[in-house]
Amino acid sequence: MVKLLINFFIIFIWFQSLNSEEIYGIPKIIDGDTVHIKSKKIRLEGIDAPEMRQKCRKTYLQISAIVGFNFKKNYSCGIISKKKLIDKINKSQINCIASGRDRYKRYLATCYKDKINLNKWMVRNGLAVAYKRYSKEYLRDEAYAKENKLGIWKGSFLRPEKWRKLN
């Protein structure tokens, strides 16, 4: 029985390895959730970053809680998301574990710089949202960013998926 379980486990691990692919190198950052390594296009799995043309709003001056008047301004949250990812990677090699491909033939992957999960880091710092439609992996990280008013959670924004539908 033990031998049977060991064989089953080995076969299971082998099949899992067939579904994943490791991609590593110094990436070109396309936007907050897409990178290219060599000729491979990689979508950071489970997250959705603001689009490059997307604007978000944040309060930059609050008169007082009594008067209740805030000055808000639009900012390019998609560009900031991309820039923060560029700064985090800092021309270093990253390692991506791909689980499959999307409808655009991009690899869907979790990417790491050293031991830092970049997908998680983007969501936890308010630079992307958890892509709930495809994964529940980063919901706690999104809640953390929202609770602490980090990144896009400092103000108001449309979730990138909704913004794409409207634009």
Describe the function of each predicted region.
Residues 2-8, 12-167:
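Small beta-barrel nucleic-acid-binding modules, primarily SNase/OB-fold domains
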